[in-house]
Amino acid sequence: MSRYYVISPNVENDGNIQDYLEQMFQTHTIMMGWSPQEHKGKMFDEMQIGDYVICARGANKNKQIFFAGMVSSENSHDWLYTRKLTGFVDLGKEKIEFGNNNAFGSSARIPAIYELKKDNEADCEICKYH
């Protein structure tokens, strides 16, 4: 059964996302700066082919959503850690709303990667966009 993840495009954790976003759009990939030895990098490394990702950043109340796709490759295991995506969809103009009922609710700090929960109705609504 597929799992659903939200991943920040802030690869170097410095707020500068434009170059990485352009590269991810051009190559239909998702990238992570954390190594598999780090908790966040381990989650990225353990994703399975057939899982879905949404590339987005920010707190739920003002989340910027960029694209989504299905994981179609293993982790590159080289920095930048990279996974290829199929079914790549540009979501920049879509009205997808994350709110207080989604994972991490009203928190101002959202992890660089997290899993949407299938037992959370609000998260399930987001998963419909795959």
Predicted features, each with a name:
Residues M1-N16, T27-M32, P36-K40, H77-H130:
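Contiguous surface segments at macromolecular interaction interfaces
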Residues R57-N62:
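Short, charged beta-turn/beta-strand-edge "cap" motif at the junction between a beta-strand
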Residues Q64-N75:
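Short beta-strand-centered aromatic/proline hotspots
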Residues M47-Q48:
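Short, well-ordered loop/turn sites that connect or cap secondary structure elements
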